[in-house]
A protein has these predicted regions:
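Amide-forming acyltransferase catalytic core, primarily the GNAT-like/NAT-type
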Residues: 1, 6, 71-179
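Beta-sheet entry/capping signal
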Residues: 4, 21, 51-54, 204
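Active-site/acyl-donor-binding loops of N-acyltransferases
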Residues: 9, 53-103, 163-246
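Conserved acetyl-CoA binding element of GNAT-fold acetyltransferases
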Residues: 18-31, 172-184
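A broadly used, surface-exposed interaction patch
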Residues: 4-26
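Conserved acetyl-CoA-binding loop-helix of GNAT-fold acetyltransferases
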Residues: 26-49, 185-197
Length: 246
C-alpha cells in the first residue's frame, strides 16, 4: 500500500440548481513513494468520480491540486480559544459535564425529532440563498445520529440558533469542537456559551470561521486553511470561489 484517499459526496445548491460534489476528506502518500507521482495519479482518479471537487488541505496536497488546475483561497480559519487557564493544570481538572447553564442556552436531546427540526430550519435558510451546502434530514442523520462519536456530541440552542458540537479529549485536554451552527454566532452567544465551557472546565473551543484578517498569517490559535476546489465548468468554479462560505 503506497497511500490512501477518502471522500464524502455532498449536494450543493449552485445558482438555484442542485449539483453533486465530492469533499476530499483524507489524502496520504507514504513518504518513500512521494517522488513517483502517485499523489497526482490518485487525485486524477478522484476527479473522475464527480465533476465538482472541494477540500480543506495542507500545503503539500495543495501543490498537487494546483498542478491539476485547481483553484484555492484562504477564506477560512481554524480557531482555537483557551477558556480555562487554571484547568490546564492537572490537579484542577474536572471531567464531569454540568447541565447548569444560563437560562437562554439549552442542551437538546439527541434524537430524530431534534435532528428533523434542525434540518427543517437548515432547508429554510438555504432556500433564501443562491449558493450553499445542502444539509437536509439525511445529512443531519448521517452527521449526528449515525456518527460513531455520537456519545460525545452535544446539541445546544440559544434563542433559535442551533449549535452542534463534539467534545473531544486530546492529550488529556477537553476540546469542544463546533461542527455546525444554523446562523453566525454573535458576541452575546459567545459570552453565554463561554459560561457553559468554564463551568464544565473545558480547556479549548475549536471552530472554523471566515478569514477577515488583512495579513494572511497562521498563528497557533488561528490557523489559515487552504480551501481548494475544482470543476470542469468554469462558471461553477467561479461561483464556489465567490460564494462558498458555509
Amino acid at each position: 500500500i503506497c497511500g490512501h484517499a477518502g471522500l464524502i459526496t455532498n449536494d450543493l445548491k449552485i445558482k438555484d440548481e442542485i449539483k453533486t460534489g465530492i469533499w476530499f476528506t483524507d489524502f496520504y502518500i507514504n513518504k518513500k513513494y512521494r517522488s513517483f507521482g502517485y499523489g497526482k495519479l490518485l487525485t486524477q482518479a478522484w476527479m473522475k468520480i464527480c465533476p465538482i471537487q472541494v477540500t480543506l488541505c495542507n500545503d503539500a496536497s495543495l501543490k498537487i491540486f494546483k498542478k491539476l488546475d485547481w483553484s484555492s483561497n484562504n477564506k477560512f480559519l481554524r480557531k482555537l480559544e483557551i477558556f480555562n487557564y487554571l484547568n490546564l493544570i492537572p490537579i484542577f481538572k474536572n471531567n464531569n459535564i454540568s447541565n447548569v447553564i444560563k437560562e437562554n442556552l439549552k442542551i437538546k436531546e439527541i434524537n430524530n425529532q431534534t435532528v428533523s427540526n434542525i434540518a427543517n430550519e437548515s432547508e429554510k435558510l438555504l432556500s433564501q440563498k443562491s449558493f450553499g451546502v445542502v444539509r437536509d434530514e439525511n445529512w443531519f442523520k448521517w452527521r449526528v445520529l449515525e456518527c460513531p462519536y455520537k456519545k460525545n456530541m452535544l446539541i445546544f440552542n440559544y434563542e433559535g440558533i442551533d449549535i452542534i458540537t463534539n467534545l473531544k479529549v486530546k492529550y488529556n485536554f477537553k476540546i469542544l469542537n463546533i461542527i455546525y451552527t444554523s446562523r453566525p454566532i454573535n458576541l452575546n452567544l459567545t459570552k453565554v456559551f463561554s459560561s457553559f465551557i468554564r463551568k464544565n472546565k473545558i480547556n479549548f473551543i475549536s471552530y472554523i470561521s471566515k478569514n477577515e484578517k488583512i495579513l494572511n498569517v497562521s498563528l497557533p490559535w488561528s490557523k489559515k486553511l487552504n480551501f481548494a476546489f475544482n470543476s470542469s465548468d468554469s462558471t461553477i468554479k467561479d461561483s464556489i470561489n465567490e460564494d462558498f462560505n458555509d
